[in-house]
Amino acid sequence: MFGKGGMGNLMKQAQQMQDKMAKVQEEIARMEVTGEAGAGLVKVTMTGSHSVRKVDIDASLLEDDKEMLEDLIAAACNDAARRVEENQKEKMAEVTGGMQLPPGMKMPF
């Protein structure tokens, strides 16, 4: 099934991919993205591990109703989470060479 040294090469490639994957996972965890809502009136900065680092609220919103502000904060958090997911997909595609994963399967495994 495998030619001479084929299995060894396959194992070496798998180890290299695993090493690259670990590096990318560390890079993703350190990255930060900013999600926005209300045309930038609310901004949420989130890490690649989905931890919220900062919430920035324009002062003009503090005079408005509480419910609208809560909605904008939630929308900004969701936007930041979406951006984290997009960045993760891009970084993982670099490692996997664009190989598509089966639906529902997320990286890292």
Curated annotation (Swiss-Prot):
GO CC, one annotated term: bacterial nucleoid
Transmembrane regions listed in the UniProt entry: none
Pfam families for this protein: YbaB_DNA_bd (PF02575)
MF GO annotations: DNA binding
Record-annotated disulphide pairs: none
Entry function: Binds to DNA and alters its conformation. May be involved in regulation of gene expression, nucleoid organization and DNA protection.
Subunit structure: Homodimer.
Designated name of the protein: Nucleoid-associated protein Shal_1591
Species of the source: Shewanella halifaxensis (strain HAW-EB4)
